[in-house]
Amino acid sequence: MNKSILLLVTLLSLYSCTDTEKTPLEEKDVFNEDYIKTSMIKALEWQEAHPIFAIHPTDWTNGAYYTGVARAHHTTKNMMYMAALKNQAVANNWQPYTRLYHADDVAISYSYLYVAENEKRRNFSDLEPTKKFLDTHLYEDNAWKAGTNRSKEDKTILWWWCDALFMAPPVINLYAKQSEQPEYLDEMHKYYMETYNRLYDKEEKLFARDSRFVWDGDDEDKKEPNGEKVFWSRGNGWVIGGLALLLEDMPEDYKHRDFYVNLYKEMASRILEIQPEDGLWRTSLLSPESYDHGEVSGSAFHTFALAWGINKGLIDKKYTPAVKKAWKAMANCQHDDGRVGWVQNIGAFPEPASKDSYQNFGTGAFLLAGSEILKMR
């Protein structure tokens, strides 16, 4: 993922969401059903009126955004969400983006699959482009699979960066479910395990973003100023958020389901341990002082995943205060016009955000979180 135009971040903007100029929410019940639904719709309306993407309307940024829109519709049944989903699917001609080897470029198909599952009109949806992408992505050779694409990120496995575990596996899983072709799920598991074995730190129970941040025990290891390993909040949010989406649709009797349940629980326990007091995770999970202000996209993915686990009974109620604290802090990061601020720009490692910085995937993460907070009331 290449960076788009960087938002200007000044020293004056580096403070927590809870200290913004926005009117504090202490007097409002941010857990009131109407308040949550209104906040979510305002976020949708603002984002639809201010489209943004990295390289194309079908890229991963919109993939993550419209995944949030789909889950918001799933919970609320508000047709404004479905209208947005259908409009973009038709405008995109139901196409993923063009790089068939790249997990990022099929993330948009989660929204297509969701529309197809919920649309009563025959022949409205066209999932053939998604099938073509998945068949090529999973079953045909490319330089990454062959291990010949040597680079600083070590692009020698298909999903060499942890973000990929949000982008492709939930789509593959949902397609396998809808098409009744479980063999797709087995292929997904094969590539998921490659990423897990390379990037998951079993001691820290967190994922390195890519091979650059994996410790080998030498002087070349990347460290934070405090000497800790570099673990990116949004990167781990991609993973645990993707796990929630994956487990949502994975068959209960799938032979590898226990692996994903256990990984989810391990990560959830670690994410809970390192939550800052104000509720929002910092962009650097083990060095919060590096950028000592909350960041919404990673925090929203964490909140979505934890709330989902509580609602499904996978984790117990001890997580509830943390989820509520995070949601309250995120609510204070939403501008009055609906824009979701304090979102780190496109990147691959911890960097600062500001109260005015936004991205469509940050809005999508906010909608994901809200969709599960609504069920917790």
Curated annotation (Swiss-Prot):
InterPro entries: 6-hairpin_glycosidase_sf, 6hp_glycosidase-like_sf, Glyco_hydro_88, PolySaccharide_Degr_Enz
Chief place of localization: membrane
Cited PROSITE patterns: PROKAR_LIPOPROTEIN (PS51257)
Keyword Protein biosynthesis tagged: no
GO terms for biological process, alphabetical: carbohydrate metabolic process
Protein family (similarity comment): Belongs to the glycosyl hydrolase 105 family.
Subunit structure of this chain's protein: Homotrimer.
Function: Glucuronyl hydrolase involved in ulvan degradation. Ulvan is the main polysaccharide component of the Ulvales (green seaweed) cell wall. It is composed of disaccharide building blocks comprising 3-sulfated rhamnose (Rha3S) linked to D-glucuronic acid (GlcA), L-iduronic acid (IduA), or D-xylose (Xyl).
Protein name per Swiss-Prot or TrEMBL: Unsaturated 3S-rhamnoglycuronyl hydrolase
Annotated organism of origin: Nonlabens ulvanivorans (Persicivirga ulvanivorans)
